[in-house]
């Protein structure tokens, strides 16, 4: 089963089917929440997730580190009422009674946290004391800064799994984001290496991204021009490519990238984004924001 088929099968589950993917017997755990949260629509209910970075099995006392999720279902009515992501606080320890997900084969592309989930049965305690998890939290809060000889100083945002910094691009400073797995230093090196490959040929990449965006979006920009309140200059592919201004690049560890350009008000302040990979070149361009 490929990733798309797997996701469709998951989204088609009823609540009863979804709950059967967890062990029948509940266990007591202490869990340290950190990172994001979200909710996904399934078949007749919403699956709410809050991410954790470690938990302790209260029966064995064993500490388990690594990304995971605590999850619970809510109805459409509860979702529409709002506030479903406010139930738990980040960087807090909770004592829970919960059912662990039953291990099963997942396709490539699924995150490790999808196999490390607990369905909440009962919240037993908030801000529960746990020295082991407090140590994990202290380490999590410790800033991680990497200094690269080409990319300069990069600061890790552990919640977003992203290094952030600035780099010189054709004589101008732009923002840089390296999208990584915060727990896997190999991805740190891969993302830095990929970005340096692009930087080494920045003149070619800059031209390719501008040309691709101009081919894809000039006609649309001309349509927007016609709706302007005041007279604006004619837009050609050449002028489009010249007018957009690169503001930031996001690079993945696998060499996939997104480049974000200022639109010079051709789309009334929307962002022009070019996408691609180091292997395939620029593959698409669109407006966002």
Model-identified regions with their sequence ranges:
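Structural detector for short beta-strands of small beta-barrel domains
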Residues: 5-57
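OB-fold and OB-like beta-barrel modules that bind single-stranded nucleic acids
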Residues: 31-34, 91-101
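Short, structured beta-strand/loop micro-motifs enriched in basic residues and often containing a Trp
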Residues: 49-80
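Short nucleic-acid-contacting surface segments enriched for D/E, G, S/T with interspersed K/R
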Residues: 77-97
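OB-fold/S1-family single-stranded nucleic acid-binding modules
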Residues: 97-136
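Contiguous hydrophobic, core-forming segments of folded domains
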Residues: 134-205
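Long, charge-rich alpha-helical interaction segments
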Residues: 177-236, 240-243
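C-terminal structured interaction module
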Residues: 237-289
